[in-house]
Swiss-Prot record:
Stated name of the protein: UPF0506 protein SJCHGC02965
Top-level taxon: Eukaryota
Subcellular location per the Swiss-Prot or TrEMBL entry: Secreted
Glycosylation sites per record: N15, N19, N31, N43, N47, N59, N63, N75, N121
Family, per entry: Belongs to the UPF0506 family.
Species name: Schistosoma japonicum (Blood fluke)
Length: 161
């Protein structure tokens, strides 16, 4: 309905002298079904050329003032700093087997943890192996983190095959 109102407003402003055209267009819009309107919109968007799009983008970027840019960048960095990836659908998290570090920008997705191989570089894994650097017991496969290392769990018995 909002789209219809916008179309009517634009059409009215362009053809303010021709009342008969306005009435005809208004009647057509009122009688048009939603599918007809969506088809018309799709046809219009398909007819837009690349040059028209690039011109529109250039005009939009020219309208951004220099004072707006630092504010936008500052707000974006604050949002990204709060974005600690725990959900696999999030933008900047790493999946299993990918490079990771224990920084904000290279976290593992979901329940994956970063198994460090060096000073800050590692690989995302399901759980940390024995003697790997840990902070929480839940990160270790053994579920036992002592003195920042994953330790053997004496309560878990390994059954030989």
């Amino acid at each position: 309905q909002l789209l219809i109102l916008c179309l009517v407003t634009v059409i009215n402003s362009e053809n303010s002298t021709d009342n008969s055209t306005e009435n005809t267009i208004e009647n057509e819009i009122e009688n048009a079904t939603e599918t007809e309107l969506s088809e018309a919109i799709e046809n219009e968007t398909e007819n837009v050329t690349e040059t028209e799009l690039s011109e529109a983008i250039e005009n939009e970027t020219e309208n951004v003032t220099e004072t707006e840019l630092p504010e936008i960048i500052e707000n974006e960095t604050k949002i990204e700093a709060l974005n600690l990836p725990q959900n696999p659908k999030q933008k900047y998290c790493k999946s299993e087997g990918q490079y990771c570090s224990r920084t904000i920008f290279h976290r593992c997705c979901g329940n994956l943890v970063c198994q460090l191989h060096g000073f800050f570089n590692g690989t995302c894994v399901q759980c940390l192996a024995e003697r790997k650097f840990c902070i929480w017991s839940s990160e270790c496969c053994s579920k036992r983190c002592r003195l920042f290392r994953c330790r053997k769990n004496p309560y878990v018995q390994v059954i030989p095959y």
